[in-house]
């Protein structure tokens, strides 16, 4: 009887222990499941609802970046992103950025990215390339600097210093005076954090690519060097925005060059005055400069703007026969009238002047009404 009571008491005493152990196991199971679930979610599950682009600047810390990402309204679970950032050493327990862990750059977050992928992307600098577009009129170095700096992390001063750095430019075969020829307007795939050296490398590669064996032969046939092609092309580029006319304009200037005539190109006068003139007058033609093609025969010492491929192709493939002159069309549509003789040129010039006078009178009458 006493043995049965002892056994019963033992069972009674062991029951709470079993319950405790079982409860601990259940809690541990659910805790492991909870932690494991969070780890799985952080590493494997998409935590973003849409695509977004972010730019990380050198002076930004991870809190700034976190705020930038959250502002895009694409984060499903902020806690998941914070955990991933902390695990990758980007975020400490006090929400302070990890030292030297965050990589500046342009990043793209997509809807299939996990929190861990984004954290590693930021830590390892897995940037998305950007398209740097160089287009339009570029008559000043400051314009080139502004166009590049607006699309890259570098500032305009960095670009300007490079365009003035003769030692740097000499590595590419150019000088600060003729650097316009180095730039080839186009769309380039670059990384937002690329240095100015990388940009210049790409320009030189594009420049070299243009100068095929066939184009070199065409230049020699015109009696021009590569730089002289760029120089004449820059004048053509400044003369008109109507690309189909480029070969005709180039033809006129080449004819004048071959006959020993002065180019008398208005854009070279504009260049002498840093393109600040609204209208070129006779007094402006007396400006003493090697770039003044009214005063000096031949080509200017260097390009007066970034010429571009269309104008360079026009110089290599001119049209227009024996034309030696051209003037603006009286239709005011941006085109020109071409002539082989001075007398025909005067007729065209008078027609334009007559149309211009009539246009100005009409404008004055409208203002009076």
State what each model feature region is.
Residues 2-5, 32, 231, 253:
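A general, composition-driven signal for non-globular sequence regions
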């Amino acid at each position: 009887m006493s043995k049965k009571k002892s056994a019963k008491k033992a069972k009674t005493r062991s029951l709470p222990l079993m319950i405790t152990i079982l409860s601990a196991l259940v809690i541990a199971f659910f805790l492991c499941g909870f932690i494991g679930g969070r780890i799985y979610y952080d590493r494997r599950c998409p935590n973003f609802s849409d695509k977004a682009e972010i730019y990380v600047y050198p002076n930004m810390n991870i809190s700034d970046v976190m705020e930038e990402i959250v502002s895009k309204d694409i984060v499903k679970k902020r806690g998941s992103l914070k955990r991933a950032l902390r695990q990758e050493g980007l975020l400490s327990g006090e929400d302070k950025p990890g030292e030297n862990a965050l990589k500046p750059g342009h990043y793209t977050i997509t809807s299939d990215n996990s929190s861990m992928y984004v954290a590693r992307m930021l830590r390892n600098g897995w940037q998305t390339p950007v398209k740097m577009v160089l287009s339009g009129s570029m008559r000043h170095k400051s314009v080139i600097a502004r166009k590049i700096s607006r699309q890259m992390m570098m500032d305009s001063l960095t670009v300007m210093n490079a365009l003035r750095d003769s030692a740097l430019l000499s590595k590419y075969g150019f000088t600060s005076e003729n650097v316009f020829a180095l730039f080839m307007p186009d769309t380039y795939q670059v990384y937002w954090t690329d240095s100015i050296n990388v940009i210049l490398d790409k320009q030189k590669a594009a420049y070299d690519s243009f100068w095929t064996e066939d184009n070199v032969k065409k230049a020699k046939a015109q009696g021009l060097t590569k730089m002289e092609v760029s120089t004449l092309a820059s004048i053509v580029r400044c003369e008109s925005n109507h690309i189909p006319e480029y070969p005709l304009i180039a033809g006129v200037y080449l004819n004048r060059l071959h006959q020993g005539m002065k180019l008398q190109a208005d854009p070279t006068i504009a260049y002498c005055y840093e393109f600040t003139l609204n209208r070129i007058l006779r007094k402006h033609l007396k400006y003493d400069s090697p770039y003044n093609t009214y005063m000096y025969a031949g080509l200017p010492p260097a390009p007066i703007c970034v010429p571009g491929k269309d104008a360079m192709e026009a110089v290599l493939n001119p049209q227009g026969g024996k034309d030696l002159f051209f003037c603006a069309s009286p239709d005011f549509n941006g085109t020109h009238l071409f002539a082989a003789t001075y007398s025909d040129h005067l007729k065209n010039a008078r027609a334009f002047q007559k149309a211009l006078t009539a246009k100005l009178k009409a404008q004055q009458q409208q203002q009076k009404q």
